[in-house]
Amino acid sequence: IRPAPGLWWCRTHAMLPTPERLGGSLVRIWWGGRNDANQSHIGWSLIDLERPDVVLETALDPELAPGRLGTFDDNGVLPSCVIHSGSETRLYYIGFKPGGTTRMDLFGGLAIKPDGAAAFERYSEAPIIERCKVNPFINTAPFVVKTPVGWRMYYVAGVEWVHRDLPRYNIQIASSKDGLNWQRKGRVAIDFEPGENAL
């Protein structure tokens, strides 16, 4: 999988490949490409695990584009997790927005596509993991697991900005009853080793 100068949404970059099993040996790889304005969009490529070095198809247009001006993802989106739930597919993603005193803001979003629908729609124009008392900095890259007793999210949680270009973050855990509304208590899944800034 690589950028495609002939496709407007992915002229440069091929970021955060995120797999979705389709059945048999077919896998859809969701990934982020950048347009001429350096804004990331989410599209996909199709591969067969029996010939993983051959790309069978790549989306001609993105499945998810940056959000409306002023929203948390107005300057770019990247995939972080795709999960099937009942009769719908959920695309959990990273939203980018230029910062002010810091280089950027990063928060986690969700888009949903019901079976048979033509396109994903945002669950909300707001992040599903926004700033809160226990997470006052960046909260992004949600990776979601559905368990017999509920939903669990592993996500990137900022703990400080070392300077305007360098956030410091670890991996924390959130819980949910429906995969939509999340409870966070600052529970750390993977913490820093001495000298580390980012996980």
Predicted segments — roles?
Residues P79:
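Short, solvent-exposed interaction modules
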Residues I1-N75, I83-A141, V145-L199:
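Beta-rich carbohydrate-recognition and catalytic domains
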